[in-house]
């Protein structure tokens, strides 16, 4: 069994963080089961049974990046469908953070199965040169639409 099997053949709820600071967004370069090469994604991960989406995001962000988030506001709902994967992703804007950015790890994986390659604040201007997923985020960030107050829904299927 490979390390991506737990994510397939079910609907997975993920909580993700959009931490923007001085025209840059915090991103994690990591392996994902639907791509052949690593991608840049906002920090986040699965919501456990009985865990709130906000608490899941705070836990995942701390594990992956060393950063603690606060002042969370739901901004995007993204539905991702690519058989055998199906995820509902909740993207929260964070207005405050504490801690130093580090390359963290995922306690669900052994040391040899770690997915994270790099963690950094990436300038908006550099996003089009990177493999950022979900793809809608690049336009939302560069256009400033991420600052709007309503919750927006996006769907990606391949």
Name each model-derived stretch:
Residues 72-76:
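Conserved S-adenosyl-L-methionine
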Residues 47-70, 80-133:
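Unchanged
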Residues 1-16:
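Acidic, metal-coordinating catalytic segment for phosphate/diphosphate chemistry
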Residues 35-39, 109-158:
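Nudix hydrolase/Nudix homology domain
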Residues 24-63:
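Conserved Nudix-box catalytic region and its N-terminal flanking loop in Nudix hydrolases
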Residues 21:
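A cytosolic small-molecule/anion-sensing beta-strand core signal
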């Amino acid at each position: 069994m490979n390390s991506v099997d737990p994510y397939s053949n079910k609907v997975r709820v993920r909580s993700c963080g959009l931490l923007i600071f001085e025209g840059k967004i915090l991103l994690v370069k990591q392996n994902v089961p639907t791509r052949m090469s690593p991608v840049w994604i906002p920090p986040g991960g699965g919501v456990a049974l009985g865990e709130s989406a906000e608490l899941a995001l705070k836990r995942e962000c701390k594990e992956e990046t060393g950063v603690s988030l606060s002042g969370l506001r739901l901004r995007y709902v993204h539905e991702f469908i690519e058989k055998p994967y199906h995820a509902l992703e909740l993207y929260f804007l964070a207005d405050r953070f504490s801690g130093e950015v580090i390359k963290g790890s995922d306690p669900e994986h052994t040391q040899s199965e770690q997915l994270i390659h790099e963690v950094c604040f990436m300038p908006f201007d550099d996003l089009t040169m990177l493999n950022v997923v979900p793809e809608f985020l690049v336009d939302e960030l560069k256009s400033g639409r991420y600052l709007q107050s309503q919750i927006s829904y996006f769907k990606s299927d391949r």
